[in-house]
Amino acid sequence: MNRFLFLMYFFCGAMIATEVTQYKAKYQFDSEEISISGIREFKKKNDGYELKFRASNIVASMFFISEFDIDEVGVRSNSYEIKIRPKFLKRDQLIEFDRQENIIKSSGRNTWKSSFISDEIAVDPLNAQIMIRKFIKENVNQFSLNLINMQEGGIETYNYSVSNNIKCDFNNEKYKCVVLDRTQPGSTRKTTYYLAEELDYMFLKIIDESEEWTNKLELKEILSFG
């Protein structure tokens, strides 16, 4: 999988139904190849929800947006779009969910079409973490999510497990953090999430590790909350 594809799994977050907290926050992303900060914003629209992230520096610009509905079961994805423009990579991709035909379609750099079960929750890299926060809020310590395969289409299952409860530092204050690990059968990649209880389980830090790299996303400033 392309290394920049991993960025899409970082820039996300929210709640569920009436517990959804709208917010705007600044995050810092660091890897061996790039360091960039940007604004992530979650808000309710007249016809659903929107979660987006926008960042830029002298070598790259990034834009991610997920549009979706939330019902009593969870997230219902509508569309997901990415635009990444480092000097050494141009990547545009649009994912559309057709729930009448039960088809997921991708256009842009990766073009494919996949079918899915009508009542199946298939999440994109952004709204996946809405489901994560839902489960953590409900004190579920182990669960799985079906994420779309951005390159080839279809659904991939990822497993999540709470591994610890610790104190985290943010803005000169201590927060109760749930430490959550994400793994996939047959892969050495591991993603660790640090979710702050006092901030409705907002993501304070995410560390993505494999044998080849370590990527890190960290909350720097909350611009608005609630």
Residue ranges and their predicted role:
Residues 5, 101, 127-130, 184, ...:
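Low-complexity, compositionally biased segments
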Residues 90-136:
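Hydrophobic, well-structured mid-protein blocks that either form specific transmembrane helices
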Residues 4-14:
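Sec-dependent N-terminal signal peptides
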Residues 18-99, 140-226:
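Acidic, serine/threonine-rich low-complexity disordered tracts
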Residues 14-15, 40, 110:
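Compositionally biased, intrinsically disordered low-complexity regions
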